[in-house]
Amino acid sequence: MLNEQVSRIAMIGLGPRGLGALEALATHSAAKEIKFNVDVFDPYPAPGAGPNFDPEDSPLCLLNIPMRDIQLRPPKGSGISGFADWVAPPIPNDAFPPRPQLGAYLQARLEALLAQQSGQSGQNLTLTHLPASVDQLRQDEGHWHLLSGGIWHGPYAEILMVPGQPKTQPDDQLGDWQTHAKHSRATLAGAYPADKLQASAKHWAGQTVAIRGFALSSFDVIRVLTTGLGGTFGPDGYSPSGQ
């Protein structure tokens, strides 16, 4: 439980949701003059963005909302502008921005927050990023301890878990697809990272591709398998590249 003195908090995972929580905590701690020490455990190279908005992924991966509907107001005093003013070159209001560009912005927001906290003396929020995963949790006498890289960290008053989209047990349909791929020697590939999918697809010319699901990710996959391999869309329809 949090008290009036310095409270230690651990965050497992970050990404956009975790970044939003950190920014809110920074604002709250400054307004209420409460001190927090926060350890963030996330092995991802761009923890502010997370894998779904990887700044290094293919620009063929697009958001499903146009630029005009993206409202990402930064905290006051953060020293960074909103996404529309930050991104260069500017993106038209009716265009759907590449997810990697939004990921780069989210990572810049995190770096601005880290720089802001490290550059202040007597700040209310102290942030430490540990680029590692957490293997185990335990609670002793009301406090939490985390095992990461063979070392126990803690004690922590509170734990915030932001797992994103962790691996889960395959459902019946995916299990059937896995069995089919194993017996037919077919390739069962994930949609992301899109660059990895694109590299694998260079060997699929003339083959039939089945896409599991039909949502945002499926449109990314379709772009990767068409324009990503050199195909073009024109007034007369689609012209494949032959790859």
Task: Report each predicted region and the residues it spans.
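N-terminal extension/subdomain marker
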Residues: 7, 20, 24-28, 94, ...
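Glycine-rich dinucleotide-binding loop and its adjacent helix/turn
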Residues: 163-216, 220-221
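A conserved short coil-to-beta-strand element within the FAD-binding core of flavoproteins
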Residues: 128-143
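Glycine-rich FAD pyrophosphate-binding loop
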Residues: 27-52, 243
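Dinucleotide-binding/catalytic capping subdomain of oxidoreductase cores
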Residues: 110-124, 228-243
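N-terminal Rossmann-like FAD-binding beta1-loop-alpha1 element of flavoenzymes
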Residues: 4-39, 210-229
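Glycine-rich active-site loop/strand segments that organize a redox cofactor
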Residues: 41-104, 108
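Short hydrophobic core segments
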Residues: 134, 152-167, 210-211
